[in-house]
Swiss-Prot record:
Keywords from the named record: Nucleus, Ribonucleoprotein, Ribosome biogenesis, rRNA processing
Entry's Gene Ontology BP terms: maturation of SSU-rRNA from tricistronic rRNA transcript (SSU-rRNA, 5.8S rRNA, LSU-rRNA)
Gene name linked to the record: UTP25
Organism of provenance: Paracoccidioides brasiliensis (strain Pb18)
Bias kind Basic residues: ranges: 18-30
Name of protein: U3 small nucleolar RNA-associated protein 25
Length: 735
């Protein structure tokens, strides 16, 4: 199973894809191992700890106790004490689950001080010795039903009854429109249009020099509507519990957020390609607020309908309010520290009175920043600061007053994970233990820092999306009489909302937008207008920046055409500048920047074996090069022993080296990240005495029309058109 080109090379699925750090599980935790997958045991072992068998709904016993106007069932396991009005099949499932629990280890009873406003609780089970980051971290010990009932005994019932006051169903609520009051005929028409790629689009401008493209299924009688801006959280349809706290932490929206929030909270898909250090926290708070709002509304709808069914056991009510499994929100993140930041947003917005296993979470997910990185760029410190391990997963379960970390996936409301962490539990190497049913009912999928995921192994992200909203292989205690019709009709992927945030957009991210974001409510893409990275070069003297276009008939043929152009045109001039008379080598100081690892291997092998380059001395640094070999290559290049140095984009992404001795730069392809252009060109000025000479050597970059997206970020939106279509010449220079 090969990874995408240039994103880790041809590697097995469980390899990080050449990731340059986190080799020991990131700072702050040991490397996780996966010998005891409790998710996998859900299908094979029949353990009482599975947690996937529900009493005819997505919610378990603890949640049922929180239903308004609903009498609390007994904590006894004796079937004689069961509620007489329950359905026989559901009662049987409860008895079966209780029988299993009876044979398991004794559960520890907890006592909580309900007079305390906030309590952090550590619940240790028989597997707590595995807390150092095993697979069980995302499917950890659950509290027993007896404990959950004990927790609720002292809760005033008037609190339960009034919790949802003011939260009555609103026909104008996007939640009701998108999930509950669904016109099956219109839904089918929209799905048919999407399946035939029948989208109608509208383009407009957004504040901050952003471009908005809104798309909706092209159905008869429906046109695209530009949604009015939303000024603040007071204008959102929030649960009262969230509305009470959101205003304290989310200030009045700026002009950009005001324009995008209506689409986010209106359950439309969003691809936002202008994520920055300054707006990342705001959008993180917004998508966490949206996810919490969705979880609470889903949960309360199920509880209210449970109450109705208990009050009217003989009625023919058809209350379809849930999916096949409980998890409703999936948040995909690049590192454990990014997960910590998301949890900080969730807790400040939800304001739980208790947080179970919070200390364990911080011990295994959080770490201090490396002091040696103080000189690193801000974007580097944001991504790799703290615990930068990229293999993790975490289940979150919400009750009325509690957030439970490390809940079993099938008992969780929200799953936070890295693509690699999810894939390790979804698809075992032996192929015998596969489990992705917990993704069958995801209704909101969020991808943050998608550009960072590209530098890990994008194939893992594609794999996760390919397994979202599939029909489950097992029932997991599902009450099919409560499952929404569009789940049963295998239409869930057309109802799911996907929110993707990235610093820039690439063909891979565009492919995700085109093929996986198929929301019947519509989708929008927000992209910046670029001035060009060539205007922001950190050198005291002007630098000649030359772009050479080569012909390429298709993306498939582009690598071959690029290599042919390099060896026939660029390399010949490189050899002339790197060798003296008679072929004797001389110091050149030429850095060849290569975005793709596969291209790096091809060029390295060519330079080492071709008769054309027999007198050319070179070194090579890739994301797989050892620290010792990196130091040797840098030393030889700086001293002039090597006249050429090969350097990959992913190496720069993970390490941000400052390469000294650079006098001229050849870009085999321009970088995806526009920040890298200025940083790499800045190598020319690391030796002040030779800055003028290096500026004269300048930069030469190769490109084709298939590089349009990243070329736009480098040369600017206005310049790009002529450079791609100019017929009078294929070389463009800027000073």
């Amino acid at each position: 199973m090969a990874a995408g080109r240039g994103r880790g090379g041809s590697t097995p699925f469980n390899v990080r894809g050449g990731r340059g750090r986190g080799q020991k599980g990131g700072r702050g935790s040991r490397r996780p191992t996966f010998e005891a997958s409790r998710v996998a045991e859900a299908h094979h072992g029949g353990s009482s700890e599975d947690g996937s068998v529900h009493s005819g709904s997505d919610l378990d016993a603890e949640d049922q106790l929180e239903a308004p106007d609903e009498s609390s069932p007994s904590s006894s396991d004796d079937e004689e004490d069961e509620n007489k009005t329950e359905k026989p099949y559901n009662t049987l499932l409860q008895l079966f689950n209780a029988g299993q629990d009876a044979g398991g280890p004794a559960r520890k009873r907890r006592k909580m001080d309900h007079n305390s406003k906030k309590v952090d609780v550590e619940v240790k089970g028989s597997d707590e010795s595995d807390a150092e980051g095993l697979l069980l971290e995302s499917e950890g010990e659950e509290s027993s039903e007896g404990e959950e009932m004990e927790d609720m005994e002292d809760m005033p019932m008037d609190e339960v009854r009034t919790e949802n006051s003011g939260d009555e169903n609103d026909a104008s609520d996007p939640f009701e429109i998108h999930f509950s009051n669904v016109d099956s005929t219109l839904l089918s028409q929209k799905i048919e249009a999407i399946s035939s790629k029948g989208w109608q689009s509208h383009k407009s401008e957004l504040p901050g020099k952003l471009r908005l493209m809104a798309s909706q299924p092209n159905t008869e009688g429906h046109t695209i509507q530009v949604l009015p801006a939303t000024q603040g959280v007071d204008n959102l349809k929030l649960k009262q519990k969230l509305a009470n706290h959101a205003g304290d932490h989310i200030s009045k929206f700026d002009s950009l957020a005001s324009s995008l929030v209506p689409y986010m909270f209106g359950y439309q898909d969003l691809l936002f390609g202008a994520r920055t250090l300054s707006n990342s926290a705001m959008f993180r708070d917004l998508y966490c607020l949206h996810a919490l709002n969705h979880i609470l509304k889903t949960r309360d709808r199920v509880l209210k309908n449970n109450s109705r069914l208990q009050k009217e056991p003989e009625s023919d009510l058809e209350l379809r309010d849930q999916g096949f499994t409980r998890p409703k929100v999936l948040i995909i993140l690049p590192t454990r520290q990014a997960c910590v930041r998301v949890m900080e947003s969730i807790t400040k917005l939800y304001q739980p009175e208790q947080q179970e296993n919070k200390a364990r979470f911080h011990e295994t997910f959080s770490a201090a920043d490396d002091k040696l990185w103080e000189h690193k760029p801000d974007d580097f410190r944001e991504l790799f600061g703290g615990n930068d391990d990229d293999m993790f997963r975490l289940g979150l379960k919400f009750t009325r007053k509690t957030i439970k970390y490390f809940s079993q996936f099938y008992n969780s409301d929200i799953i936070l994970a890295s693509p690699l962490g999810l894939r390790m539990v979804m698809d075992k190497e032996d192929g015998k233990k596969q489990d992705f049913d917990f993704l069958s009912s995801i209704e909101i999928a969020i991808v943050d820092q998608a550009d960072a995921l590209l530098m890990q192994n994008w194939e893992h992200t594609e794999y996760v999306f390919a397994h979202l909203n599939l029909q489950p292989k097992e029932s997991h205690g599902c009450d099919f009489s409560r499952v929404r019709n569009w789940y049963l009709d295998d239409q869930a992927k057309y109802v799911r909302q996907t929110l993707t945030f990235s610093s820039f957009i690439t063909p891979e991210i565009n492919a995700l937008f085109s093929s996986r974001m198929q929301n019947t409510a519509g989708k929008i893409k927000a992209t910046p207008t670029y001035e060009g990275a060539i205007l922001d070069i950190p050198l005291p003297v002007p630098v000649k920046q030359t772009f050479s276009r080569f012909n390429s008939s298709s993306p498939v043929k582009d690598p071959e055409n690029r290599f042919k152009y390099f060896t026939s045109t660029v390399l010949s001039s490189l050899i002339r500048s790197s060798t003296g008379r008679g072929g004797t080598p001389r110091a050149s100081g030429t850095l060849i920047f290569i975005p793709s690892y596969l291209d790096f291997v091809r060029i390295r092998n060519y330079l080492a074996t071709s008769s054309q380059t027999e007198h050319l001395s070179f070194g090579a640094i890739s994301e797989y090069t050892s620290v010792r070999d990196v130091a040797r290559a840098r030393t030889h290049f700086f001293s002039g022993r090597h006249s050429v140095l090969l350097y990959t984009e992913r190496t720069h992404h993970f390490r941000r080296y400052h390469i000294r001795g650079v006098k001229r730069i050849i870009m085999y392809g321009v970088p995806e990240n526009p920040v890298f252009w200025g940083e790499v060109v800045g190598f020319l000025g690391l030796d002040p005495a030779g800055t003028a000479e290096a500026a004269e050597g300048g930069v030469r970059a190769m490109f084709s029309k298939w590089d349009a997206l990243k070329m736009e970020r480098i040369v600017g939106t206005k310049r790009l058109g002529n450079m791609l279509t100019e017929k009078g010449g294929a070389t463009f220079s800027f000073v």
